[in-house]
Each structure stands twice: as C-alpha cells, then as structure tokens.
Amino acid sequence: MNTIVTFGEIMGRLCPPGFNRFRQALPGDLNLTFAGAEANVAASIAMLGGSTRFVTAIPDNDITQACLSNLRGLNVETSDIVLTDQGRLGLYFVEAGANQRPSRVIY
C-alpha cells in the first residue's frame, strides 16, 4: 500500500471540560488536544489502517513533544517533522456546542 503524506500546520486546541463555556471554566482547567486539517487527515487514514506521514515544522519544547507522541500513538509517521529552536505552536480555543447553542472557535 502507498503512503499518504500530508503537509500542514498542527495547532494546540484548548477547550473547557464538557460543554462548559470559558466564563464557567476559567479560572480553572482547559483540556489541550492537537489538531489541524492535515494532521487530522493523516490520523484518520492511519486509524483506518493506512500508512501516513505528516510533514511540518514546530518548535522543540515539551508541549510539541507531547504532540509528537500523540501522533505516533495514532500510527502517524513523524520522522519528517522538523523541530526548530524558533517559532511557536499555534493555539485556538473551542467551546463545544450544547443543544441549541453552536460551538464557538476563537483564534
């Protein structure tokens, strides 16, 4: 089987637990997960049994090491990811929708 290679940005996704709004959760805890369209595609294909590689550049720090561990745990090949001593990991914030209230994304 061929390997699918995706190129793109991966970001940290911060959201309050459950269906809480930020004003209900803060000060307090936010959950950190990692997402980005291309990384999501690579992870989805890998979970279906396909071979995938993700290519990007990210700063080398403890948070991005956790991100790499997460991708590897989903069977996404990460050896082509460039770790740099500069730059930042992008962040975005999500409030999950509930009932008639839509989800809200803040960049």
PLM regions: where:
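Positively charged, low-complexity intrinsically disordered leader regions
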Residues: 1-23
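Short glycine- and Lys/Arg-enriched binding-loop motifs that mark or flank ligand-binding interfaces
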Residues: 4, 31-33, 55, 86
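Alpha-helix C-terminal capping segments
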Residues: 33, 40-51
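Conserved N-terminal subdomain of the carbohydrate kinase-like
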Residues: 51-107
